[in-house]
């Protein structure tokens, strides 16, 4: 299965992808983790992410392509946090097509804004992540709405979208995702 996990910051993408990887054995490429690792040596990237800015499509595509080239994408993967724009989606579909592969599913984790803010504030206190400060949270949610919602619409038109109520408990959300995996991979 080749899938995408989308959702606003705080929707549980990382948590669910961790469960998918550990319980279903599917490789997960988490762009947020990749970016945080690269930020240790790339000051320009660190400045953009720390201020809540949006990393350009060309930079993001290059980073994801590097990751996908290192993974065996033919056996399946889940992308966490990518693509976030229509240009990135087009790039991904072209990348897969050049390898005679297709996208199988897109999971949209959906959560009310007030619950997202509550989750992100709690995460900031626990982890000290600089991208979870209130001012940055508001900007990240704004960027998500502007940039990523067209991805959801495009994937829905292609029949790939599976909306998941991510306001539920972790196990309930995982079961909803697993049910889709079971249906799609039959």
Curated annotation (Swiss-Prot):
Reaction(s) catalysed (UniProt annotation): AMP + ATP = 2 ADP
Region (NMP): 30-55
Record's keyword annotation contains Thylakoid: no
Annotated GO MF terms: adenylate kinase activity; ATP binding
Primary subcellular site in the record, as a coarse category: cytoplasm
Catalytic class of the enzyme: transferase
Enzyme Commission code(s) on record: 2.7.4.3
Binding positions for AMP per the UniProt entry: 31, 36, 53-55, 81-84, 88, 129, 140
Family note: Belongs to the adenylate kinase family.
Domain-related comment: Consists of three domains, a large central CORE domain and two small peripheral domains, NMPbind and LID, which undergo movements during catalysis. The LID domain closes over the site of phosphoryl transfer upon ATP binding. Assembling and dissambling the active center during each catalytic cycle provides an effective means to prevent ATP hydrolysis.
Quaternary context: Monomer.
HAMAP family referenced in this protein's UniProt entry, alphabetically: Adenylate_kinase_Adk (MF_00235)
Protein name: Adenylate kinase
Name of the gene encoding the protein in the UniProt record: adk
């Amino acid at each position: 299965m080749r899938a995408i996990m989308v959702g606003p910051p705080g929707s549980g993408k990382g948590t669910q992808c961790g469960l998918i990887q550990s319980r279903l054995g599917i490789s997960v490429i988490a762009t947020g983790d990749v970016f945080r690792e690269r930020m240790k040596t790339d000051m320009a990237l660190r400045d953009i992410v720390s201020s809540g800015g949006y990393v350009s499509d060309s930079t993001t595509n290059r980073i994801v392509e590097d990751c996908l080239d290192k993974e065996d994408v033919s056996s399946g993967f889940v992308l966490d946090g990518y693509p976030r724009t229509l240009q990135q989606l087009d790039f991904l579909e072209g990348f897969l097509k050049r390898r005679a592969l297709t996208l199988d599913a897109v999971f949209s984790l959906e959560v009310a804004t007030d619950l997202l803010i509550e989750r992100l504030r709690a995460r900031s206190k626990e982890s000290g992540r600089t991208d979870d400060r209130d001012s940055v949270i508001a900007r990240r949610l704004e960027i998500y709405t502007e940039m990523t919602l067209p991805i959801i619409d495009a994937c829905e038109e292609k029949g790939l979208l599976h909306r998941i109520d991510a306001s539920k408990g972790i196990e309930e959300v995982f079961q909803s995702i697993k049910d889709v995996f079971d249906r799609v991979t039959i």
